[in-house]
Structure formats: structure tokens, C-alpha cells
Amino acid sequence: MTAPSTSSASSVVPSGADTSPHVAAIHEKILIVDFGSQVTQLIARRVREEGVYSEIVPFQKAEAAFAEMKPKAVILSGGPASVLDDNAPSAPMTILEAGVPVLGICYGEQTLAKQLGGTVEGGHHREFGRAQIEITDDCALFDGIWQKGGKYDVWMSHGDRVTKLPAGFRAVAQAPGSPISVIADDTRKFYAMQFHPEVVHTPDGAKLLSNFVRKVAGLTGDWTMRAFREEAIEKIRAQVGTGKVICGLSGGVDSAVAAVLIHEAIGDQLTCVFVDHGLLRKDEGKSVVDLFRHHYNIPLVHVDVSETFLGALKGVTDPEQKRKTIGKLFIDVFEAEARRVGGADFLAQGTLYPDVIESVSFTGGPSVTIKSHHNVGGLPERMNMKLVEPLRELFKDEVRALGRELGLPDVFVGRHPFPGPGLAIRCPGEITEEKLEILRNADAVYIDQIRKAGLYDVIWQAFAVLLPVRSVGVMGDGRTYDYVVGLRAVTSTDGMTADFYPFEMSFLGATATRIINEVKGVNRVVYDVTSKPPGTIEWE
């Protein structure tokens, strides 16, 4: 359950939205023009890993964003369109004529080449997946990484290809399906590549992006969480003044970091509200209360409404209906508690940068909803409060780094992601207190096993699922007919894609034995070996 997440913070309270300058305003910046690639966020994260602030904007808004941001360099992303289509997306010529370094990736290479007078052809030499390119000439992007004449693995995903160079460019790499795979104009500092350096499947991709950021654009890297902390505190003080702030704590990392940062800025002007809906992991409510009320001395209102939530969920089996029921009820409870606190002028949310950019549509049409996001929705409008969103410029890994900078314990900052609806979506079918207790205990054993094996920080997310089926078993001399527990563990860098974790069979066997022996009501354990895609990380 998370109060602090919203799909589009700027659209929640038009009259009271945060209009103060971004913390990033004083830093070196790179603008990323998004043409609709599924992995554009990875570009931004790779740039941030170099200590440089990056911001993603849709191509339709790129010209205005460039004028406002005054970036030191620009990256053109990939995308699903063809530059040969009528009304194909393009980069504003004002950017290409501004004298700043430009890097084009996949579609970004094609539109850069075409807009500057080159030729792009489509259709006949599609390349998808792993490929090998050969370096035919040196260039600044390759410095210290790739050598002339060498062959290197990359990740391709394209149908069109550049067949004639624009004036001033030279080809510096080739591949079987794209003879002009990397192009360079050293005078204008324009570079472009047909493959995707931002994905892990291009082993040297992060180094190539580093060369563009550091050696081509000449940026020094002044984006650190220590600097962000100091600047964010000043921004919060300027925005809030003497006003009061309430913050919904979920038990997750985002809301916790937001709360500690805001408390450092304004002290007891902040009150946190922790709504325990009865769908949390084992001992989670106690750990949240202990951390904030006793360790940080942050004013905290703890509300136990588990009976109310379980009553509302009785008979509900559809996962979307579960999410919507929990979301609506949370808003009702949080609103009542916030009014009881009284006098709050601001609502704090742990909105992250992906929450802001995920809502952008690049075609003007609707996007497919895979799962509803559980958030506070219209709370600020209903309660006539303004938003404080101190983390809205950060990615998840940056939030964790900020949490450590703020002194939050590693055991808390490094916790695996936990869904807003909690255990409700890890218990397919109808939810009962009995099922939740079985699931809590099984999950606690599983996580304990992972920690003892030293694997917790290696795994992106791990959890148990209580399946809506029973199986026959034999325990002692008797027949059992009990529940089946599914175990899930994945590795990922961002949650957008994920692979199942390849546990040793001995680990799985030992874990299954512990769960069956220690958790009453379970007689069978299975392990989920589905990656994302085709599956999602959570079961519902």
C-alpha cells in the first residue's frame, strides 16, 4: 500500500502543483528526446550513473524543453516508427543547429541521418537481437573500449537502415544487416549508432555512453545524492514555509526516504500517517512504527483498519477489483485520518521520475493498462492540499542511495519492492485471514533462507505466493489436503524486464522442507521459472 505514488503528479492538482524550480536546475544536464522506445528510461539511468542529470521528454515537446533546460548535450532515443512513414517523428532542427553534442540511438540514428541529408532505406535487412559489429575506423565513442578491426557484441532492434551518409559524417562500424552501423561527425560532435547501448545485452554499452557524456560532451558529473540532499532540503523549506505537511507511509522505501528528507527539512511540521490494511508482510507494521516513531522521532499516526479492508475484500477474486477496492478504501481512510490530524497544507508523496514519465503517450492514443497503479489519486484535490514531491526527479536506485545518505539502515533501504495492494495480489482468489497468515509465514521463511544464503541483495525481488489450489500429501502416517505455495525470485536492473533467479536445487529443497515443516496448512512448494516478459513479476 503506498500513498506516495501517482502516475502523473502534475495533473493531480493543477491549481496547487509544485511550481518551484527543479533541484536539478543548477546542474549539468543532458536532454533525452524520446521517440517511443520501451527502453528510453535505461538511457537516462545510464547517464545518471555517470553523475550527470538527464531528463526525458517526448519528441513533441523537445524544442520547448531544450530552450528551457539549456542542456549540454542531447540524446535521440529509439522508437517503433519508421522515418520513411508520412508524419514520422523527427528531432527539432533548432536542436541540431544549436552547437551541442548529439547522440542518436537506433531510430535516433535514422532520423538524424535523414534530417541532415542522408538516405534511409527500409524493410529488407531487419536485425533483432544479438548481433556483432566490426569497427572500421576510430572515433571518440570507442576510445579505450573498441579497437579498429575488432568485432563486438551488440543488441539490434531495427528494420530500417542508413544507406547514404549525410555531409560531414563518416562510417566507423558495420554489421551484416547494417553496413553503416555507427556514424560520426567529429566537427559537430554528432554520433549515432544503429544498436542499443543502453541495454545490458550490449556488454560495452554503458562505457560507450560514458564516453559520450564525459569525453564528447565534456561533462564532469556534478549530480550526487549528497548535493541533491542539501538542495532538496532548501527547496522543501522554501515551498512549505511554516505550513504543515502530512505523508502517507506505506512501509516501502520511497515513502520512507521522502518522509525522512522532509523531516530533516521542516522537523515537526511533518506528520506521517501509516495505514495498516492487514495486507502487510510479517511484522512489517511494527518495524515501520519502530523506525519512524522511536528511531527518527517523527510524529506518526498508526491506524489499524485491517478488519475494514478484509471485510471489503470478502468474496472479491478479480485482481483488478482487488486493486481498485484497496485503492478506494485507502483514500477514504487516509482522508479521514488526515482531517483528524488537522491543518495540513501539503500532502507529501514519494513520486519517482518513472511515475512522471510513464504517463506520456507518444502517439496521442491510449496506452494499454497492464495493471492499475494503486495511489492516492485525487486526494490533494479533495482535501485542498498542495503536493510536496521531493523525489520526483529520481530513479529507484537514486532513492536508495539518498536513503543511505540520510542514514536509513541498509536493511530498510535495500528492501525488495512491495506492491501497493500488499499480500492481496500474492494470494490469488478470495482473501481470508487464514490464507494471509499462511502466506506471511511462508514468505518469512523464504526470505530468511535467502538472507542466510547471502543472496538477498543479489535478487531484485523475491516473495511467496499462496496458490488457490490444494494438493494431496502425506505427513507422518496421515493424508493431508493443504495449500500449495509458489516461490518467486527475479533479477532485474529496473523492473521493466526480469529473469528468474537460478537457485541451486539444494537451496530450493531446503526452503521447501522448512516451509512445509514450519507453516501449518502447506504441503507442497513450487518454484516459478517465468521471466518478464511474457509474465509479470507479481502474479496479479
From Swiss-Prot:
Pathway: Purine metabolism; GMP biosynthesis; GMP from XMP (L-Gln route): step 1/1. ATP binds at residues 250-256. Keywords: ATP-binding, Glutamine amidotransferase, GMP biosynthesis, Ligase, Nucleotide-binding, Purine biosynthesis. The lineage of its organism: Bacteria, Pseudomonadati, Pseudomonadota, Alphaproteobacteria, Hyphomicrobiales. NCBIfam families: guaA_Cterm, guaA_Nterm, PRK00074.1. It comes from Rhodopseudomonas palustris (strain ATCC BAA-98 / CGA009). The active site is at residues 106, 196, 198. Homodimer. One of its GO terms (molecular function) is ATP binding. Catalyzes the synthesis of GMP from XMP. Pfam families: GATase, GMP_synt_C, NAD_synthase. This is GMP synthase [glutamine-hydrolyzing]. It comes from the Bacteria. The gene is guaA. It catalyses: XMP + L-glutamine + ATP + H2O = GMP + L-glutamate + AMP + diphosphate + 2 H(+). The keyword RNA-binding does not apply. Residues 223-415 form the GMPS ATP-PPase domain.
